[in-house]
Design a protein with these regions (language model features):
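Histidine-centered nuclease catalytic patch
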Residues: 511-544
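A conserved non-catalytic segment of reverse transcriptases
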Residues: 215, 304-378
Length: 544
């Protein structure tokens, strides 16, 4: 499969974009990021600054920045200028336009999205150019952020996920002598209230560029509003800025909570912190320990322009349990259980019911195609917890709703007729909602997925000190990627063979094919034979 591309000088921007050697670009950027990490660990701040400048002024980094904003989910969402880089010509010209000198970001376009509680969350949508500039500077800032990050911070960090945070909760709370009390932290409007002064004084990046982003303003209903605090919620670099704002809390708790008992023997008050973006918990041996921590927490946040919500910040006994990242964590008769929270189950079932009710006249196959991705996605998220019983209950609720859907379609038919039409014996189950069709003389069966079929697998947590930008951790992340892919390809020998044959790489972009990024099997004719490859979905769409 001839997929090698080279960077070349050409007068045709469309051809120039297609001729970019993405493997070479990724390699150049990765090398500079590794050097930034090395210099930062050695305390060579001048060298870090120099490498940041080199990276943000390189063609390779600019090309990757443009590629990311034109392939992510927001690629079809314009800013205030209405511009979208949908052509190869526009993309290549965008690379050439990313310059520090004379750069002036445009105001954000204010939109509102619904939160889980029904309230509206404000988002600021930057223009495509501003997104690309943020993506460019993020390439230089992210490696530094990883070096300085709290070890048990898991949100919006490369190679980390919600399941890592939940597994860390399980690690620190599951033992017999584990802490019994938990402080559930809630920060009032974290993104909206971060101090600009604190960011400009503490974020190790080009302060002129950062200040322009922070002060660019917001346009809503044709009116321009100044931004005096907070970071652009909706900006590519915003989650990293928020993370760096909250980093340091773990060290503060560690230094302030070394106590001595009466026998002059040091003991730990069992203070641990687990954070995912602005959601966090802090554990303690006693309720009094956590009450003493609250003033420290308030002071730490106040320095950054943030405020702890007194109403929503709770101190809970582990036997009563608490909700965190969609899971409920509690001890029952001394055994720690992490299972889907009642709120999460209700929200999911409401989504399922809405999908079914919105498609009353659709074909059965359409309903199955709409529901299967939801069922698989939700089950995969919660498969790391004690979720089997919940999965069974959810399956039953979905069955009841589909039975109502089928009865409504045929009000004059009996139950047996409806059951025979829509529900069939499949594998070991009698009541499987499925469609049978005959194509080319073969019977195709398309069943609805059962959540209970999802195997419960304890998540293998990332090592807290692991840094994906540090060359010293390269072999660790390669082993971790292999483990995840083996898990996702278990029982699919042909796919596993292709993955190994391709040396884990996508043949179009040269990047790793992992369980986290969507991929598919694509066919190509070579020397009169059909050859199959594993390819990233986004790469295939770009190269069609």
């Amino acid at each position: 499969m001839n997929i090698n591309k080279t960077m070349c000088a050409t007068t045709d921007p469309s051809f120039a974009w297609k001729s970019i050697d993405w493997k070479k670009c990724e390699a150049q950027v990765k090398k500079l990021q590794e050097r930034i990490v090395k210099a930062r660990k050695e305390g060579r701040h001048g060298k870090v600054k120099s490498l940041e400048w080199t990276l943000t002024h390189s063609f390779a980094a600019k090309a990757i920045a443009v590629k990311r904003v034109t392939t992510n989910e927001g690629k079809k969402t314009p800013g205030v200028d209405g511009a979208l880089w949908s052509t190869d010509k526009a993309k290549y010209e965008a690379i050439l336009s990313l310059k520090r000198n004379g750069y002036k970001p445009q105001p954000l376009r204010r939109v509102f999205i619904k939160k889980a509680n029904g309230k509206l969350r404000p988002l600021g949508i930057p223009t495509m150019k501003d997104r690309a500039m943020q993506s460019l500077y993020l390439l230089a800032l992210e490696p530094i952020a990883e070096v300085t990050a709290d070890p048990h911070s898991y949100g919006f960090r490369k190679e980390r996920c919600c399941q890592d945070a939940i597994q860390q909760c399980h690690t620190i709370l599951s033992r017999k002598n584990s802490p019994k009390w938990v402080l559930e932290g809630d920060i009032k409007g974290c993104f909206d209230h971060i101090s600009h002064e604190w960011l400009l004084n503490n974020i190790p990046m080009d302060t002129k560029i950062l200040k322009k982003w922070l002060k660019c303003g917001v346009i809503f209903k044709g009116e321009l509003f100044k931004t005096e605090e907070g970071t652009m919620q909706g900006g590519i670099i915003s989650p990293t800025l928020a993370n760096m704002t909250l980093d340091g809390l773990s060290d503060l708790l560690a230094t302030k909570n070394k106590r001595v008992n009466r026998k002059n023997e040091k003991y730990s008050p069992m203070v641990n912190m687990v954070r995912y973006a602005d959601d966090f918990i802090i554990t303690g041996r006693t309720k009094e320990t956590l009450e003493e921590i609250k003033p420290m927490l308030i002071e730490f946040l106040a320095e950054r322009g943030l405020e702890l919500s007194e109403e929503k910040t709770l101190i809970t006994h582990i036997d009563d349990g608490f909700d965190f990242l969609g899971f409920n964590v509690r001890k029952f008769k001394g055994v720690l259980l992490t299972q889907p929270s009642k709120k999460s189950v209700k929200k999911f079932l409401d989504s399922i019911r809405y999908t079914i009710d919105s498609n009353k006249s659709c074909k059965q196959e359409t309903i199955i195609r709409l529901l299967n991705p939801k069922i698989i996605g939700w089950a995969n998220y919660y498969r790391c917890g004690a979720s089997s019983r919940t999965f069974q209950k959810v399956d039953n609720q979905i069955f009841q709703k589909l039975w109502q859907w089928a009865k409504r379609r045929h009000p004059k038919k009996g139950k047996r007729w409806i059951a025979n039409k829509y529900f069939h014996f499949y594998k070991t189950r009698r009541w499987t909602f499925l469609v049978k069709s005959i194509k080319n003389g073969k019977v195709d069966i398309f069943p609805l997925k059962f959540m209970f079929d999802t195997k419960i697998i304890r998540h293998k947590k990332i090592k807290s000190e692991a840094n994906p930008f540090d060359v010293e951790w390269k072999s660790y992340f390669e082993e971790r990627m292999t483990y995840k892919m083996l898990l996702s390809l278990k029982g699919r020998k042909s796919l596993l063979y292709m993955w190994n044959k391709q040396k884990c790489k996508c043949p179009l972009c040269g990047e790793n094919i992992t369980a986290e990024i969507q991929w598919n099997v694509r066919e190509q004719k070579e020397n009169g034979q059909i050859v199959r490859y594993l390819v990233h979905d986004k790469c295939y769409k770009q190269n069609r």
